[in-house]
Amino acid sequence: MKDISNNPMELFQKWFYEVEEFGGDVESNAMTISTIGLDGFPKNRAVLLKKYTWEGFIFYTNYNSEKGKAIANSPHVCLSFLWHNIERQIIIKGVAEKISENLSDGYFESRPDGSKLGAWASDQSEVVPSRKYLDDRLASFEKQFENKEITRPEHWGGYIVKPISIEFWQGRPNRMHDRIKYTLQENYDWKIERLAP
């Protein structure tokens, strides 16, 4: 692995750019987020990274969803990116916290109207009686917001995952892969270690 930066966010930015440029037909911002559920079991699911900054990784969801409730109960989460076609993986451990309402409002305004209405209509992760129930709820919100601005519901918004460790994995021949792990220290410097594959 070349060009190992002192800051893992610089290396993430470089890898993310490279997968977007050379990764082919791949959704580069697809990631899994793992949480500890209210039942005590881990669960992961795919979400989309919408922004990253030097502070962390931002995604959006329904705060009342299963993942939202899990984060409220235990904000320690794990993100992972896997890009098979260029043999790279990134694993991020961190703490999730809600972003500001202004940031959530700004992103919500950029979404298509159908997605905005879906945020109102779907009680994400709740049991529903039928498909018709969902379609009827969507239709009711279409009517409610007809010729009106579709505002962001309070139960929908963004989280930022602030990393405490980031591991970069690069495939190599003979399974002698590169693994570089960054761990955040108390003084906010990053400890860099090479791990055996």
Question: Which functions belong to the PLM regions below?
Answer:
Residues M1-P197:
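Binding-site signature for planar aromatic cofactors or substrates
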